[in-house]
Amino acid sequence: MLEGIRIIEIEGLGPGPFASMMLADLGADVIVVHRHSQPMPGMPERNIIDRGKRSIILNLKEEDDLTNLKKLLQTSDGLIEGFRPGVMERLGIGPEVVLKENPSLVYGRMTGWGQDGPKSKQAGHDLNYIGLSGALWYASPAGQAPFTPPTLVGDIGGGSLYLVAGMLAGLLNAQKTGKGTVVDAAIVDGSAHMMNLLMSTQDAGLLLSLIHI
């Protein structure tokens, strides 16, 4: 379904690579930029998440390699990166630079807390995001500490899936208008959004089967 769509993934952890894996599963041509200091691609922990992707090794602190990445981005439809806010800008490949050179590109950003806000510069983990968003409430028996669910809830549910939705919407918009966009996907925001139905149903007094009631 996404044949002919090229996505560049800057190697990272968890939600970003999982999102690009989903796009590759749908037919997109995903090229992973592996860091020069890391082992060669194909390590066991990445065998699944790198399925269907091509790869290239670049040192983004070297001018020649950075130039090669920019050339790739000029002929691509999308980019996915999961660095902390400001890192891509310091490398010289932030949205303003990249979208100036390729105005139709969809620039996907995967973070825990978003690009701005009081926690944007802080590290975080799945449990932090689902705790502050209210998603951990769902696994809270009355009078007991909440059970810790798998990291699928925040990282994948609130992160990867929302990034994929944003990327697909951005790609459709780019096809119609020729204009790219920045998709700012924050795990805490996605996790909170997933709770809309449960929270509203609980508020209406209709959710009577939660284990914490």
List each model region and its residues.
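Acidic, glycine-rich segments within the central catalytic cores of soluble metabolic enzymes
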Residues: 132-211
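Active-site loop/turn elements of alpha/beta-hydrolase fold enzymes
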Residues: 35-36, 60, 85, 112
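Conserved small-residue-rich beta-alpha loop and adjacent elements
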Residues: 1-38
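Rossmann-fold NAD(P)-binding glycine/threonine-rich loop
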Residues: 93-102, 109-125
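A structured beta-alpha segment of the ubiquitous adenosine-cofactor-binding alpha/beta core
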Residues: 49-100
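Conserved N-terminal glycine-rich FAD pyrophosphate-binding loop of Rossmann-like flavoproteins
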Residues: 40-50
